[in-house]
């Protein structure tokens, strides 16, 4: 690597960056022929940091700065490299060498360039870059994933009106990236404050993706070898818990949110009407999203069984439901129950539905006693009480298979079982029959 470094020092910044990609491509391609998972050594990472991210190797040396045009040209070089490299394994290891966080001073430059590269790949639909980014999101700590998600949201949902359509179109190009992007976005926007409510354009795009193909949010889960114990501090296998958080907290978060007013240019009435219209659109979108999430949950039992993970792997961890319930309880306390009764009722209804379907499908592994303890401090909700109580079961019916309890034979909660029919009573005594005498006339006189 030292010989390569000396030759690169004589080049300008752009040609050196292009040359280092070329050398590492040859190096890792040869390694892949002998080992399925080549090791990215320290020398390779240092070359990339010095000649791609412009971080000097010598201590005290001033870092080089690329101007905007040079940075754009560097992004084009990288996009072209990943597009032209036909072997996915080589692309993946080069991408990992470039952008895996190292915990050093180069990480800021690394994340900045990654955000710009993925944003460019979205704009020009470079599928190999998006696929590499999807793998990166899957194996990188969540703190870095949300940084990339924030860059894409700012570029396509905040800066230029209407640019969200460009991001929306990658749904068919790279569904795997879309799945990981949704998971990152739900980790970023947790509705804990008004600043962390997802922008309307982002919400509308995600709902349209999931409503068109609900299986989108299961792509990572369905296509990844899964261990029973998932690593902590990384993105979830699916965005299910994040989407449930959105649907459940949305009624309370939007009730808490106050409409923003312009600096005197728009009247209070106009701003209020605009905010009300936006809230109505948001409520419809969250209702649509909630339906899609329930539909996905209902399919999970089959998928978990096929992977031999039913009852062994909870895609929705009980430990993640605990802070969600605490946040709902806190929001309900902050809002005046007299003014937010409908919103509290809606949030608890959605929570109850999600809990019931998730437990039934095997996505949430817990007992009814766990739920009673968890939800004991929440405001009263009829549907939630039914879910917590669970089905009432009596001894099996003799004419039915064991374990089957028809609801018509289930007694009410407050009463004991009563037999449907009393014991058979003795037969009534029979009376002797009367003989018919044909010669006797029947006296009849009409009433006048």
UniProtKB/Swiss-Prot annotation:
Main subcellular location of this protein, as a coarse class: nucleus
Cystine crosslinks: none
Alphabetic keyword roster: Chromosome, Nucleus
Superkingdom: Eukaryota
GO biological process: brain development; eye development; mRNA splicing, via spliceosome; RNA polymerase II transcription initiation surveillance
Places the protein is found: Nucleus; Chromosome
Keyword Nucleus on entry: yes
GO CC, alphabetical: chromosome; INTAC complex; integrator complex; nucleus
Subunit structure: Component of the Integrator complex, composed of core subunits INTS1, INTS2, INTS3, INTS4, INTS5, INTS6, INTS7, INTS8, INTS9/RC74, INTS10, INTS11/CPSF3L, INTS12, INTS13, INTS14 and INTS15. The core complex associates with protein phosphatase 2A subunits PPP2CA and PPP2R1A, to form the Integrator-PP2A (INTAC) complex. INTS15 is part of the tail subcomplex, composed of INTS10, INTS13, INTS14 and INTS15.
Family: Belongs to the Integrator subunit 15 family.
Primary role: Component of the integrator complex, a multiprotein complex that terminates RNA polymerase II (Pol II) transcription in the promoter-proximal region of genes.
Identification of the protein by name: Integrator complex subunit 15
The organism's taxonomic lineage, starting at the top: Eukaryota, Metazoa, Chordata, Craniata, Vertebrata
